[in-house]
Swiss-Prot record:
Keywords of this entry: Ribonucleoprotein, Ribosomal protein
Chain positions covered by the region annotation Disordered: 1-20
Record-linked InterPro entries: eL8/uL1-like (IPR050257), Ribosomal_eL30-like_sf (IPR029064), Ribosomal_eL8-like_CS (IPR004037), Ribosomal_eL8/eL30/eS12/Gad45 (IPR004038), Ribosomal_eL8/Nhp2 (IPR018492), Ribosomal_eL8_euk (IPR001921)
GO biological process: ribosome biogenesis
SUPFAM superfamilies according to UniProt: L30e-like
Protein name: Large ribosomal subunit protein eL8z
Pfam family, one: Ribosomal_L7Ae
Family: Belongs to the eukaryotic ribosomal protein eL8 family.
GO cellular component: a single term: ribosome
Length: 258
């Protein structure tokens, strides 16, 4: 028979050596209570006293998670996906309205031409329309081809009815992040809503693709959106208490059964 290959030899158990302490030194554990020893360094981020504006922003965000949010308001949490939003903003930037400097230059050239006795053909430029009242009028007159709404308008009541109006008039609409980005397109700090009435011939193919995708994401999903409530998410402590209570009730019910 072939010799058996044995494993490693058992390691002898180490003897525990008792630590010799000097009886002259007393053991004084630190008390980290009020007026006691300084606590060890740790992350104190949550105890920072933030500025009032930041505090209100945080409280509003938490409150939106805790309270039940009706579907009309909850729809503003569903925004356009990043890739489609990038293509949309590229399109909107092509139709930016002129700023003050460009307008001044155009009027100066026109005045010079008129002074020389030339006839100037003034073509109406194709630009992005903005302003809530103006956009509403364009939707009601069925002139709007696409409506872009900001998700963070404050107060939200200004635009909460706009998606319903767009659906009624069968105008494609989308909700994007955020009002500052929309404002930068029209040379303003913020803009709650933008609108395109028409595009140039070379952009029509790309624009039709964007419209199709937006319709599929927003106009066609109306039945889902109008039923979906938001919020109602409690904090971690509250969830832990609820779980413990449910566990206790389940245990009592099991005991009654036996």
């Amino acid at each position: 028979m072939a010799p058996k290959r044995g494993g490693r030899a058992p390691v002898p158990a180490k003897k525990k050596t008792e630590k010799v302490t000097n009886p002259l030194f007393e053991k004084r554990p630190k008390q980290f209570g009020i007026g006691g020893a300084l606590p060890p360094k740790k992350d104190l981020h949550r105890f920072v006293k933030w500025p009032k504006v930041v505090r209100i922003q945080r409280q509003r965000r938490i409150l939106k998670q805790r309270l039940k949010v009706p579907p009309a308001l909850n729809q503003f949490t569903r925004t356009l996906d990043k890739n489609l939003a990038t293509n949309l903003f590229k399109m909107l930037l092509k139709y930016r309205p002129e700023d003050k400097a460009a307008k001044k230059e155009r009027l100066l050239k026109r005045a010079q031409a008129e002074a020389e006795g030339k006839t100037v053909e003034a073509k109406k430029p194709i630009v992005v329309k903005y302003g809530l009242n103006h956009v509403t009028y364009l939707i009601e007159q069925s002139k709007a081809q696409l409506v872009v709404i900001a998700h963070d308008v404050d107060p939200i009541e200004l635009v909460v009815w706009l998606p319903a109006l767009c659906r009624k008039m069968e105008v494609p609409y989308c909700i994007v992040k955020g009002k500052a980005r929309l404002g930068s397109i029209v040379h303003k700090k913020t803009a709650s809503v933008l609108c395109l009435t028409t595009v140039k011939n070379e952009d029509k193919l790309e624009f039709s693709k964007i419209l199709e995708a937006i319709k599929a994401n927003f106009n066609d999903k109306f039945d889902e959106v109008r039923k979906k409530w938001g919020g109602g998410v409690m904090g971690s402590k509250s969830q832990a208490k609820t779980k413990a209570r449910e566990k206790l009730l389940a245990k009592e019910a099991a005991q009654r059964m036996t």
